[in-house]
Amino acid sequence: MRSGSPKRVAPAPAARSLALATLLAPCAFGPLAAQAVERPATRDTAARDSATGEPHDLPRDTYADPGVADLIRRARAERYARARGLQSFEVTFRERIYAGLSGRVVRRERAVFHQERAARIHWDSDGDRIVRWLGVRRGVPIAGIGTEFDEEPRTDDVFDLDFEFLDPAEDRIFLGNEWALHPLADSAGYHYRYRSGDTLRIRFAGADRTVTLVEAVVEPREARFDRIVGSLWFDLDDALLVRAAYRPAIEYDFAREEPEDADEVPGFVKPIRARVEYITLDYGFQELRWWLPNRMAFDGTATIANYASMPVRFEWTFEDYSIDQPQTLDPGEDALPEGWTRWVEQDVEVEDAEGEGGSGDVPQPAEDDSLPSRDTRVIHIVPPVDSLLAAPELPEPLFAGSVDAFDDEELDQLRARLGKIDVPRPELPGPQLLAGPLPGLLRYNRVEGISTGARFEWPTGEATSFEVTGRIGVPEWEPGAELRFVRETATGRLGVGVYRRLTDLGDWGRPLGVGNSVNTLLTGYDDGLYFRETGIELFAGHGGARSSWELTLFGERQQTAPKTTNVSLPDSWGERILPPNVSAERGEIAGVSGRLRMFSGVDPGDPIVSGTLWGEAAAGDFDYGRLALSTALTVPFPAQWTLALEAGSGTVFGHPPLQRLYHLGGPYTLRAFEPGAAAGQAFWLARAELGKGFRVASNDGYGIGGSTFRVVAFGDAAWAGDRDAFGTEGWRASLGAGFSVMDGLLRFDIAHAVRGGDAWFLHIYADGLM
């Protein structure tokens, strides 16, 4: 409980990071931030072993060996002994947070949010805790929006700081803005198993001292998001936690964790999942006496509707400790320099029996008057806010390619260690039938017309399911069906399926997505060329930090799919008729196809290189191979000017059917031309764009690029034809102007063909060059 002067509750760092990741999809982590840890029925508090202090009915398999049993019992007893004999310390604290937007629907990741903070902090075991802020910077790079401070700093949440994470008397295990059940809680044995791990001895030659660190591996009894798998390292002499690497036992699934709320969320953003890759923290051995906070890092990814993903990272570092020295940070209200701000927050906190501040899993509660309490003040001191943005103490943003708190080798090792810990099979939701305006179930194109479908999903594991999808289009009346068994996580997928479906040529864009459906109806422009396929496939995909790949093995029969409708808004005015579809050749083939996407960075203030390599090889009625490469470069200039260049080329070997040639035309290749206006065994394309950016808010002092929207001028040139005639004869070109929102996430272009045609086109599409 808290009393004293009012205080906003500062969210835990992970919760803040996750919440910030939802700027473009608010429902992604909202349920996660709101979930409460379930409390089991209260047990008899007197039923404890007099020797161990643990409940008599603790499961026999709680400890795999006597060594880990003794270690965990001692660690539980010594949880609050970390600060024993420590009067005070000062330390420099730095924080970095990053949230991005990527996924299968975009060519490269965009930086959605970042925050960097630096402060000098004073902790006192009996007196005030002091935070002198050194620097603060945060913004939304995708929109070019930087830090804007409140007129009154004490009301600005950018200065919120949860001191419990910095308190050496704490060893918090956190998840979202709720605590996961701590593996050292009195009741933890009902929910975790423990076994001994590795041993590490560190010798401090100058002090002639050796410290032995021992590992306890934590396995959850239940496959729940608020249970952890963990590798905990303790100082063997003191049984103090000195390093931890852990993650939730399973992925977060919105439908499973919050079924009632999930029913109220629009279907087009489902499923909503989140995977925490790791949470890791360690302590430094200050003056070879006290284990005090050193580093902390978090990495997670959320996915929306299996198309968009939102990576979230944050890290803390603690440097330049000064132990048991008089405080130097607070000059007092009267001596405060001009332009500085000082305020005081007063907290009285009573901890529950688990030491978790009232949000733990508490089967054995204690009376409040038997628990430790604290009555402390937190003093915040803020210099003039204009000086905070460019403070030299600020770390570089996480997306700037600077050195991280933990190097790649350390993170790879802890991922591997966590991946070896057993997790029980989770409780599965029942099968469900999905229909209506959901991703992949409702669409419109000139072949099917209005095509609607229904999907039956039967979960078979934590991330696996069996799916049956059926659909039919009007006026085509051609049925389609897919049966798939798929394993899908926040970072990848693997599956097998059989199908009879309409597909697009697959080289550029997403013609069967929602965007092209709306575009077809409103503008009379269908960006797709389609054919029908029936077959079987084995598919896999994975998304990494700066790359992603997809691979498919297939055997199928391909056939033509003629146009069946002209309905669109311009058609109702008699101004435009949808063009015919490509005439696909019928044949049976088997082969492999793949796609690799890469990009160099996400900072809109730096040049960004992105590229896609894709190919296919097949044999059967047609024997052929395809290979193509497209590369783009975006270069920022002063005054929010940006230049983007793209070049691509590809060729086909052997004897492909018509539908496996390259077909140019449309917003991603050659604007102002119909899809398929140029087609052949080989192609090249070159595109250039020059944009002037504008921001909706002042960015004084914000040194990171980005624009809320841009006005863009562009030109496209391309050629497609016979491979032996590769060159410029018959090349086509267009010029135009457009409007870009949020770094090209949404584009509106008007293009005019200037070579090889004279048409005008309006293009509305997603994921432009800039």
Locate the predicted segments by residue.
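Outer-membrane beta-barrel pore domains and translocons
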Residues: 94-96, 123, 298-299, 457, ...
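Outer-membrane beta-barrel initiation region
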Residues: 70-77, 351-473, 479-481, 498-500, ...
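Outer-membrane beta-barrel "beta-signal"
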Residues: 594, 737-745, 758-770
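Extended lipid/amphipathic-ligand handling interfaces
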Residues: 75, 230, 236, 278-287
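Structured extracytoplasmic
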Residues: 35-229, 250-258, 275, 300-436, ...
